[in-house]
Amino acid sequence: MQEGKNIWSLILAAIRKELSEEEFYIWFENLYFIDAIGENIKIATPNSFHKNQVEKRFSKRIKEILIEKGHSTINVEFIHSQNELKDHNTESKDIPLKAITHQQDLQTKNKDIKTHAKNIINNTKQYSIKEEIHIKYRNPFLKKKYTFENFIIGTNNKLAYNASLSIAKNPGKKYNPCLIYGGVGLGKTHLLQSIGNKTEELHKEFKILYVTAENFLNEFVESIKTNETKRFKKKYRHLDMLLLDDIHDLQKKEGIQEELFHTFNALYEDNKQMVFTCDRQPSELVNFTDRLKSRFTRGLNVDISKPNFELRVAIIEKKAEEDGIKVPKNILNLVAKKVTTNIRDLEAAVTKLKAHIDLEDIEIDTNIVDKIIKEIIAYENDHTNTPNKINIENIKKVILRELKLTNKDIEGNSKKPEITKARHIYAYLLRNFTELSTIEIGKIIGGKTHSTVLYSINKIDKDRNKNLEINNLIIELMNKINKN
């Protein structure tokens, strides 16, 4: 059995390197090694929906990993049968003494779910029904880096900050629902996540769920396909706090709006806290049902505007300190003066300054700052002004021409590094130049899954901040797409 556990740990370690943190937790946190007989490893899943999705998305890759690690004859089987789980858990001969003691302790102690999440690879645990119940509502999308303590307060966001902190301390009391609105990169997600983290700290018994509107939509669509809508409704209507990010992504999508309407009513009637974010006021949402818009305005609506000069300087100084770089005050002030868009762009400018210092071993002067700012402004213009004007075929033509690829390369399943990289870039550009969802982008790129597309987008986004070569390539491709 121990060998089986070790093999499963190898699989988890390999997959974790290939997925974003969010993807890994959402698909693998609730999986448990339960048995290894001969060359067959059994892994428990929380429900049939989860089982089907893991098999569909990862079975092929798991087999490839087993072959790579020299375990080609091993088979991994995912199960969710409660009878089989009970049979296994009652057979003490298959359960080590440590596991039996662990299960007995669970009857008298509340398990620390956070510890489980961190130790999922190093300490794969024996499956137990009690443990599954506790973990069911743990939110993998709450990131501990977002706190009220490291949120920089200014006149543009003070009201939103105070309201968010009040909600975390007294959920479901004063401001329910609450909607925070404002442009991209101004700190809406930071506040939303901070609410979740602070509430989790103060109200440990609360079932809190943070989710983006896109993931909410994708999960709803999957639940329809797999006939699991009851599970979906139960998940979202039995929460203590729902944190729904970017509700503007639900425009023109009537089915999910209907579902959100009923979810809203169920939570509101039970005095459960809801917080939403949006890039505009509810009244400005297009193709959104009036009754749902009226629900959003039932509580508190608070905006976050662009940071003023003083706040921009504070943000830049904090980011520079976090990144461990020393930049003259006049350079930081120059960045603050010229980058007036949002917090995300300010932090991106500091990241690029660090890259120049680390990779080129040069001192930063005004010429380098001007170059960096031009890149950021060019990207911002591309991102905000062209989504509806760029033809998908134009994006594809530029990718194929500039990267010297064929249709078969970009839409196939080749694992060659240069082709895989090109597909990541293709997904990233489609996301930035169009309003296509990740599911729609996946269909264009040879039938890739939502998770695969999301991984590609996140990877290029991260690489742009760390790798000057990648960043310059993306800017060059963007410019050629605009001219094409």
From Swiss-Prot:
InterPro entries reported in the protein's UniProt record: AAA+_ATPase, Chromosome_initiator_DnaA, Chromosome_initiator_DnaA-like, Chromosome_initiator_DnaA_CS, DnaA_C, DnaA_dom, DnaA_N_dom, DnaA_N_sf
GO-annotated biological processes: DNA replication initiation; regulation of DNA replication
GO CC term, one of those recorded: plasma membrane
Region: Domain IV, binds dsDNA, residue numbers: 358-484
CDD domains assigned to the protein according to its UniProt record, in alphabetical order: AAA, Bac_DnaA_C
Top-level taxon of the source organism: Bacteria
One family name in Pfam for this protein: DnaA_N
Region (Domain III, AAA+ region): 141-357
Known function: Plays an essential role in the initiation and regulation of chromosomal replication. ATP-DnaA binds to the origin of replication (oriC) to initiate formation of the DNA replication initiation complex once per cell cycle. Binds the DnaA box (a 9 base pair repeat at the origin) and separates the double-stranded (ds)DNA. Forms a right-handed helical filament on oriC DNA; dsDNA binds to the exterior of the filament while single-stranded (ss)DNA is stabiized in the filament's interior.
NCBIfam families cross-referenced by the UniProt entry: DnaA (TIGR00362)
Protein family membership: Belongs to the DnaA family.
Name assigned to this protein: Chromosomal replication initiator protein DnaA
Organism taxonomic ancestry: Bacteria, Pseudomonadati, Spirochaetota, Spirochaetia, Spirochaetales
